[in-house]
Amino acid sequence: PGSYMVQPEDRENGAAVDIILKGKRQMKRKYGVVDYLRKHYPPPEGSGEVEVEFLEGYDSIEGPDGSIGFGVFVPPEEKIYIADDLPGGEESMIETVAHEWKHWLQYCNDEAYDEEEAEDFAQQIVEEFL
């Protein structure tokens, strides 16, 4: 996806304002879900923080193990990477962030990564958040 260039005629009919507002709403949702997870699903006492980075211009991410997905949690960095241009829109983005958040919580609790548990958690967060 490229960037949208506002044309002079767009400024006249208010389209530029709509584009800017849409972008702000998406950003609020994107970071809002991270804030929501931090508040309602924190790690166990004594665990560090996890950083969540949205990779603009990417629709998928290759994990350290070579697998391709929309997001990945990298334990040594305690960092979650999310493809910012993933298909499926807002719901898919929220689901992906929550899925990787669950893997981080599993890591913090010294639990094995459980994909089914992460998927169930992601669905729960989508229902709670939207």
Predicted segment positions?
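Hydrophobic (often cysteine-bearing) scaffold residues that line and stabilize catalytic clefts
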Residues: 29, 94, 114, 118
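Post-HExxH zinc-binding segment in Zn-dependent metallohydrolases
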Residues: 111-130
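Auxiliary, metal-adjacent structural segments of Zn-dependent hydrolase domains
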Residues: 18-81, 130
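Short pre-active-site segment immediately N-terminal to the catalytic Zn-binding motif
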Residues: 80-96
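Active-site recognition of the HExxH zinc-binding catalytic motif
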Residues: 95-107
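N-terminal amphipathic/basic-hydrophobic helices that include classical n-h-c signal peptides
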Residues: 1-22
